[in-house]
Amino acid sequence: MQPGMIYAHSTALIKNLADDSMWKDICGIADRNLFILRADHFVKGILLENIILAETYKTFQKIDPDRYYVSQLSITLRNNNQHVEADMILVDKQKGESYLFEVKYSNQIVIDQTKHLRNTDFLEYIDENFGKVKSRLVLYTGASSKQNDVLYLNAATYLKRLSIVSNTPRPEIKQLLNENCNTSKPNLKTTSRKKPRKL
């Protein structure tokens, strides 16, 4: 299903639920508003992940399908039975390099967002099975920044660069992941819990 259609359907369902008098009676106003906010945020997050993954896949299949591999990655490590994942992995098979991505519909830098990207066992697994991890990135809706060797890139900027890279003769991944970004330290959070907004 198209991302726009998914969003239209989910928005209509959330609105119907919000207008349902029985649900209003069961839930307090704060609970209802928090639920609606979280549901909207959840849907937009999934859509952003799917758009980024699909556009990256299409671009690198167009450039050289034998050289580049793009996928989601979710595994359980054998050595410690730990579940780890990346929203996207981009592999340059020719160079033996990997790039790991988390995609977040958020404008906040939250330390928990990078727990898998900082997992040394996971990074070793990637090095051994896909190619040396060259860069770890979070694509999100905030300003570009770099924190603890993890690059935070604005998702809209990434998609614009992706469009340019797809039309460039002999493109390089580094053109897409330009690390010349704001390295100032924004406000950091340790969790991603949000307070309910009053509607």
Sequence positions of predicted segments:
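Accessory nucleic acid-recognition modules appended to NTPase machines
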Residues: M1-A86
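Generic low-polarity alpha-helical segments
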Residues: Q2-A8, L13, L117-N119, R136, ...
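Polar/charged alpha-helical tracts
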Residues: K15, S21-K24, D66, E124, ...
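Short, surface-exposed, polar/charged, turn-prone segments marking secondary-structure boundaries
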Residues: L34, L117-N119, E128-G131, S163-T168, ...
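Conserved catalytic cores of phosphodiester-cleaving nucleases, focusing on short active-site segments
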Residues: I52, T56, A86-V110
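Structural motif
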Residues: N80-N81, K93, E128-N129
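Catalytic cores of nucleic-acid endonucleases
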Residues: G96-S98, Y105-Y158, T183
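Domain-level recognition of nuclease-like catalytic cores that cleave nucleotide substrates
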Residues: V138-L199
